[in-house]
Amino acid sequence: MTPVVALVGRPNVGKSTLFNRLTRTRDALVADFPGLTRDRKYGHANIAGYNFIVIDTGGIDGTEEGVEEKMAEQSLLAIEEADVVLFLVDARAGLVPADIGIAQYLRQREKTTVVVANKTDGIDADSHCAEFYQLGLGEVEQIAAAQGRGVTQLIDQVLAPLGEQLNADQAVENEENSANEEADEWDTDFDFENEDDTALLDEALEEETEESIEDKNIKIAIVGRPNVGKSTLTNRILGEERVVVYDMPGTTRDSIYIPMERDGQQYTIIDTAGVRKRGKVNLAVEKFSVIKTLQAIQDANVVLLTIDAREGISDQDLSLLGFILNAGRSLVIVVNKWDGLSQDIKDQVKSELDRRLDFIDFARVHFISALHGSGVGNLFDSVKEAYACATQKTSTSMLTRILRMAADEHQPPLVNGRRVKLKYAHPGGYNPPIIVIHGNQVEKLADSYKRYLSNYFRKSLKIIGSPIRIQFQEGNNPFAGKKNKLTPSQLRKRKRLMKFIKKSKK
């Protein structure tokens, strides 16, 4: 599971600044779920090689309603679900009574807590932070979130003790990036015209991704808001006799993993709780299901985003969709409760889908009735198609040919009077497909041309249901920083020339 880090503290200590600093490092979409608790934000971060979910909680001020009551309203569930709590304090303002009250509450929760003194820039940090040791929560870490100073070291120190869970996540990340590192070694002497070179590179990349692709058990996460028919869809897929054992709607804290088999294919259905509307969250029962839904998305191969045809697309649906795309997961859109609608209403729903979801035109859309079972069986065809596209192997030579065709049809733009040169492309990973393009000045390509390349590769490779990630590698000059070694003849000539220059200056 993806680790969860919660940011807590009184107002104006820099929680949101640190949240933005963490999520910006990967340019992640910050998914805002209004109504669960006001001013709560969730985002995905990648710092120091660690992937984790970060929660920005509302400020806690114990002077009005008491620390415990305010904590229960704003941050209790975040603390309960977090693996690590970062307790932010203001180094400039010093220790205040509200900090002491929050610290007392955190000690009672027996949760891993780290005191983080923010705003240490421009002051004697050691002397200003000494008083925070009175909180009794161990060492005090010093950062300046606005400038980013100390943030990487903080995350590395905080998350490293989590051990095997994070090491596994980091190993997956390293596995995805190993192909890029391998390609960097080829960059100076790789000949993409030579079939032997491309075959060797494909073989190296294939070894890196063989294990992940050979995993034939497809994990399907069914996500969406409550009352969209998510549980009914799970019941229809699994059968009633299975639901009695596994289904616990509205009360479970964890996502339920249910193995099943269909037509000889192994699946794991991940049943998740829903993301509720404003004012509909029962804190005593729901147990912060949003985090579990986000973790289920991270763990799945294919995500079924379930939408209620009668209510249309909500902000919660778009927030979940953003997190799915950011996680790089394959996607199938499921519009439920399609039965009983008039043709006019159906046309309106389809028009709204086309308008609001035009940026994910690669995903299949299914109109079903989970209650009556119509259209449910067709979902598995799209699931297998999306998974196959996300894990298909493509050779370097084919990707390079597609890159050339794309450049011939629409040349790269000029940058400072020089045209961007695209040399070759190779696979950089799978699930989602990663295409690495090498060239000169590629970091200066306009976003519009990057989208053009992404769409061209998708159309050429016929990838359905899975996002494509395009990464660009700048071609390094192998002679940069090196001086030519002169021959003896050149040295003698240089010596004569220097003598002539000195003589002419006299």
From Swiss-Prot:
Binding site for GTP 2: 224-231, 271-275, 336-339
Database matches in SUPFAM superfamilies: P-loop containing nucleoside triphosphate hydrolases
Residue intervals of the EngA-type G domain: 3-166, 218-391
Domain KH-like: 392-476
UniProt-annotated binding residues for GTP 1: 9-16, 56-60, 118-121
Coiled-coil segments on the chain, per record: none
Keyword Transferase: no
Pfam families referenced in this protein's UniProt entry, alphabetically: KH_dom-like, MMR_HSR1
Keywords: GTP-binding, Nucleotide-binding, Repeat, Ribosome biogenesis
GO BP term (any one): ribosome biogenesis
Top-level taxonomic group: Bacteria
Quaternary data: Associates with the 50S ribosomal subunit.
Similarity annotation: Belongs to the TRAFAC class TrmE-Era-EngA-EngB-Septin-like GTPase superfamily. EngA (Der) GTPase family.
Name this protein carries in UniProt: GTPase Der
Source organism of this protein record: Actinobacillus pleuropneumoniae serotype 3 (strain JL03)
Taxon lineage: Bacteria, Pseudomonadati, Pseudomonadota, Gammaproteobacteria, Pasteurellales
